């Protein structure tokens, strides 16, 4: 199949096709190999993980998204109005790929960090509400009281962090559960 023909199939059909190929490969594996494969899946926590539904707002932990591409995928696959919590303090990340998607789906951007200049310059005029906070706890509070009904609060850093995704994800989940 040519790349041109594949491109006309659409993203959903391509993903479905790839899933079918993987399903066929999985059927050919032995049970013990499958158990081992699925046992390792627990290690992929904090990737599009539902945390809680509070006052009509769903909180989603995507702390494992340490790149623009991973965050793009998550935003693309999240329906409804999005309140995006992103990490600042990284002035080297190129967010340009996220701009068209953010324009369509993100209603509020909460920037966590001491220097959020890059996030502001990348999304000013694209996302209607952009605020700065210092901690993930403050970000969760701001999202909860944003006034955006039926929103999905998405914690997706979009940039590498000195702290591990595991630590960031645990902090986010803990703060949500403290609401």
PLM feature spans:
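ATP-dependent carboxylate-amine ligase
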Residues: 3-12, 19-30, 36-179
């Amino acid at each position: 199949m040519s790349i041109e023909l594949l491109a006309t199939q659409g993203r959903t059909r391509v993903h479905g096709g790839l899933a079918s190929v993987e399903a066929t490969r999985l059927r050919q594996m032995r049970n013990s190999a499958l158990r081992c494969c699925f046992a390792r899946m627990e290690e992929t926590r904090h990737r599009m993980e539902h945390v809680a539904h509070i006052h009509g707002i769903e909180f989603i932990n995507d702390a494992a998204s340490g790149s623009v591409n991973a965050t793009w995928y998550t935003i693309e696959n999240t329906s409804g109005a999005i309140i995006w919590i992103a990490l600042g303090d990284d002035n080297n990340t190129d967010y340009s790929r996220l701009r068209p998607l953010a324009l369509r789906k993100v209603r509020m951007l909460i920037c966590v960090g001491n220097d959020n200049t890059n996030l502001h310059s990348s999304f000013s005029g694209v996302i209607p509400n952009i605020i700065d906070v210092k901690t993930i706890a403050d970000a969760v509070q701001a999202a909860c009281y944003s006034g955006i009904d039926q929103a999905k609060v998405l914690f997706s850093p979009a940039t590498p962090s000195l702290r591990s995704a595991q630590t960031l994800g645990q902090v986010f989940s803990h703060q949500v559960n403290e609401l």
